[in-house]
């Protein structure tokens, strides 16, 4: 694994820990997952993809809460991870988990319909 990937994974772990144990913002949903962190090669910026299970309002509130806590999170990362530069953090909403769950649901429904509509003469 190359250095940038290792740093991205370490930052991902630390941000997850900070969100779970340090942030007390009531806007944050209980079901926030950090799905991916992409750090630029110069280590100046980190794009953090978060998945929030809940309504659109809960997603928007959670994203706002994370954005307002970005400075605190950056400071904590600076204390926990030894880097020359602590990356500036940008949060982005990631809907891939919900899309995956929706596609799985569609596949299951289609599969159930196909089983129910099988003609006994076809077997």
UniProtKB/Swiss-Prot annotation:
UniProt feature coiled coil, ranges: none
Alphabetical list of InterPro entries matching this protein: KH_dom-like_a/b, RbfA, RbfA_dom_sf, Ribosome-bd_factorA_CS
Keyword Cytoplasm: yes
SUPFAM superfamilies, per the entry: Ribosome-binding factor A, RbfA
Keywords: Cytoplasm, Ribosome biogenesis
GO CC annotation terms, alphabetical: cytosol
Cellular compartments annotated: Cytoplasm
Gene Ontology MF annotations: ribosomal small subunit binding
GO biological processes: maturation of SSU-rRNA
Transmembrane residue ranges: none
Subunit structure: Monomer. Binds 30S ribosomal subunits, but not 50S ribosomal subunits or 70S ribosomes.
Annotated function: One of several proteins that assist in the late maturation steps of the functional core of the 30S ribosomal subunit. Associates with free 30S ribosomal subunits (but not with 30S subunits that are part of 70S ribosomes or polysomes). Required for efficient processing of 16S rRNA. May interact with the 5'-terminal helix region of 16S rRNA.
Family per record: Belongs to the RbfA family.
Name of the protein this chain belongs to: Ribosome-binding factor A
